[in-house]
Regions:
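Transmembrane-helix signature of multi-pass solute transporters
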Residues: 95-102, 184-191, 218, 243-247, ...
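Intrinsic disorder in cytosolic terminal tails and internal cytosolic loops
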Residues: 1-19, 201, 444-454
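Glycine/proline-centered helix-kink
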Residues: 39, 128-131, 149, 154-166, ...
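12-transmembrane solute porter fold
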Residues: 20-43, 56-64, 74, 94, ...
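Hydrophobic transmembrane-helix bundles of small-molecule transporters
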Residues: 170-276, 283, 431-432, 448
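Interfacial helix-cap and linker-helix signal at transmembrane-aqueous boundaries
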Residues: 48-49, 79-80, 164-172, 226, ...
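Helix-loop-helix hairpins in multi-pass membrane proteins, especially solute transporters
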Residues: 73-210, 392
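Structural signature of transmembrane alpha-helices in multi-pass secondary transporters
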Residues: 31-34, 62-65, 69, 96, ...
Length: 454
């Protein structure tokens, strides 16, 4: 046991050999397929909206998934401790696969959006649960060596999504963008069922029933307030979001099991991580949603080429992330995340100019590479920085909370930019301005020196 009362010895599920390797493969597959679904739809959406109609609801296919994933992340972490990893994993996988199958059978864009909510809830439950299972499978010393596998799996799922989505649209049907998840997910679930043994359940874990409900409802009202339509209804939704948000703050101060402990809310690193998570998600998912549409509508590109357009950003993310930790150690979040978001803002600004003046595909690819080079260190150290400051027994909840802010930032920004649909230069400029504001804020408020592992 460490000083926080958390065991750092291997639990019964962390046995070496074939079973552990099989369980590792299962959670890696689950992580890939849930990350894959976040970007695979990007190259398929122009085709989907042409076939099903409802182009004015284009952004909701993304926002519904990301918002539901946020809710899934918020409720799954403690449930995995209370009920066991397997029940939460299988429930999440079940929702994800049922949602995927129904999305593949959808006959209207409204049905597709509803089924994307199911998908998102499942994906949101899967991603933190897979990371929790990986902590069960490996001792503390071993985890450092295998962490790259899980980071790489998430990155690979996001990177290949647009390419595979474009290929499926051109050579099969857009419906296979969703249906392809079913056999892969079933195989991952079978592998985990056969190879993984749950550690003892923790009956001492307290659940916050009202926190996720208030947070989810408030965010949903804010999302609805961004939908074009009746001004009175939008203002009513915005008012509801503010009231429910205030209720959430009051409830969390009184809760015995808050979503994020109050002592962490006051930590500058955590607050900086929240800002970085929201901005990182906003940039990543708004580009994933709107760049392929721009490429198909104004660039005349095929779905495969439109999907490939995102590859420089994702590769830039991977390259930039390798420098992020070095910057974090040298100058803290103020340097790593602040400089990262400044570079990302530059890339988004160049992309806006490319869209405005028609500089061509190569200029767009270069702009997205610059954006990714900045976004990689900014987003990764916005998570690693707060993790390094948090006590060991709070790191799980810090990780899931910051991951939820990334999804929430993505869902709200994709929906907000839909108000400027068709004005791609303006959309990219707004995203760049957001990154620039966050860069300035982090340069002033973020911790200015490296933190040591707790």
């Amino acid at each position: 046991m460490d000083g926080s009362g958390v065991s750092v010895e291997p639990v019964p599920s962390a046995r070496p050999g074939v079973a552990r390797r099989t369980a590792t493969g299962a959670v890696l597959l689950a992580l890939v397929v849930s990350a894959f679904e976040g970007t695979v739809v990007t190259s398929a959406m122009p085709t989907i909206t042409r076939e099903l109609g409802g182009q004015h609801l284009y952004s909701w296919v993304f926002s519904a998934f990301l918002f539901a994933s946020t809710v899934g992340v918020l409720i799954s972490g403690k449930l995995a401790d209370r009920l066991g990893r397997k029940p939460v994993f299988f429930a999440g996988m079940g929702l994800f696969l049922v949602g995927s199958a129904l999305c593949g059978l959808a006959d209207s864009v409204h049905a597709l959006i509803a089924f994307r909510v199911l998908q998102g809830l499942g994906a949101g439950a899967l991603q933190p649960t897979t990371l929790t299972i990986s902590a069960d499978l490996y001792t503390l010393r071993e985890r450092a060596a295998v962490q790259g596998l899980f980071t790489g799996a998430w990155g690979a799922g996001n990177a290949v999504g647009p390419l595979i989505g474009g290929w499926l649209v051109m050579h099969a049907s857009w419906r296979w963008v969703f249906l392809v998840n079913v056999p892969v997910g079933l195989f991952a679930a079978l592998l985990l069922y056969l190879s993984y043994r749950d550690p003892p359940r923790r009956t001492d874990v307290k659940l916050d029933r009202w926190g996720p409900l208030l947070a989810g409802t408030s965010a949903a009202m804010l999302l609805f307030s961004l939908e074009p339509g009746h001004a009175e209804l939008r203002w009513l939704c915005l008012l509801g979001a503010v009231v429910l948000g205030a209720g959430l703050v009051f409830q969390q101060r009184k809760s015995h099991a808050p979503l994020l402990p109050m002592e962490l809310v006051k930590d500058r690193a955590v607050l900086s991580g929240v800002a970085g998570g929201i901005a990182g998600g906003a940039l990543l998912y708004s580009m994933a949603a709107w760049v392929p549409l721009w490429m198909t509508e104004q660039g005349g590109q095929t779905p495969i080429v439109a999907g490939l357009t995102l590859l420089p950003m994702l590769l830039g993310w991977s390259v930039g992330s390798t420098f992020g930790v070095k910057l974090l150690v040298r100058g803290g979040m103020r340097l790593s995340a602040g400089v990262g978001f400044a570079v990302a803002a530059t890339g988004a600004g160049l992309l806006a100019l490319t869209a405005a003046y028609g500089w061509g595909t190569y200029a767009a690819l270069a702009s997205l590479a610059v954006l990714g080079m900045g976004l990689g260190p900014a987003a990764s150290t916005s998570l690693i920085g707060p993790q390094s400051r948090a006590p060991w027994h709070h790191r799980g909840i810090v990780t899931s909370s910051l991951y939820a802010t990334r999804l929430l930032g993505g869902s709200l920004t994709v929906a907000a930019l839909a108000l400027a649909r068709g004005h791609f230069a303006l959309q990219f400029a707004i995203a760049g301005a957001l990154a620039g504001v966050v860069a300035l804020g982090l340069a002033v408020a973020a911790p200015g020196k490296a933190t040591s592992e707790a």
